[in-house]
Amino acid sequence: MMTHWPSPAKLNLFLYITGQRADGYHTLQTLFQFLDYGDTLHIEPRHDGEIHLLTPVNGVENEDNLIVRAARLLMKVASESGRLPAGSGADISIEKRLPMGGGLGGGSSNAATVLVALNHLWQCGLSIDELATLGLTLGADVPVFVRGHAAFAEGVGEILTPVNPPEKWYLVAPPGVSLPTPVIFKDPQLPRNTPKRSIDTLLKCEFSNDCEVIARKRFREVDAALSWLLEYAPSRLTGTGACVFAEFDTESCARQVLEQAPEWLNAFVAKGVNLSPLHRELL
């Protein structure tokens, strides 16, 4: 029985803000691709109906952690529909590699891995569509991790179309700051009316991120990291930050630049993949 579950990072290869709804949420167009790099969740089934998170996060109550919330949500929905075997529970721990507030999707990926893994381990039998719907109640980025394929996203990120962008190599640089998403979306200078374009058009254009100008303005660490990367390769912000990345055609090129990275830049090299490492393990 599989007890080690990948919880991969994602990159937003581009991100455009196309509007703002009456409820305050921003509409967007973005391209998600996974990395062959991320956290690992260790999940051992229990038979007493309890959920235990063995690796708590400082400053976050276990019951508020997305990992526990995802487990309890699946437990509730499966139980209410008569698909939860009696006594289903789990001990969950995490090997954390992804920074919090980094724009790599760490928390959303963790939640998705819990939904997919426990659905498998508990043999609940929920479909991917059902799991993705549950995931959306936990966060806008959770469904793409549940579905496990690179995707073009619209709406608030919930309308997903599978795509297959080139699987390049990336040097990813966490600048050492956590960048709260509301800081970006509340900034009055954030571009909010980028014209909507078709997938085909966007894939042919040079990629960019509407949030980047705000992140660079508000956080000097982001600006410094991106300025350094841009000396070597096309580079952008992922999500709302704070991580930035540079793209390369080969692993060796990416690693040559990594060797020159300043000590304050805690960078790593990873490959972009269109099939999530989580779903690859399930094949």
Swiss-Prot record:
The keyword Nucleotide-binding applies. It comes from the Bacteria. Gene3D superfamilies: 3.30.230.10, GHMP kinase, C-terminal domain. One of its GO terms (biological process) is terpenoid biosynthetic process. The gene is ispE. It is an enzyme of class 2 (transferase). This is 4-diphosphocytidyl-2-C-methyl-D-erythritol kinase. The active site is at K10, D141.
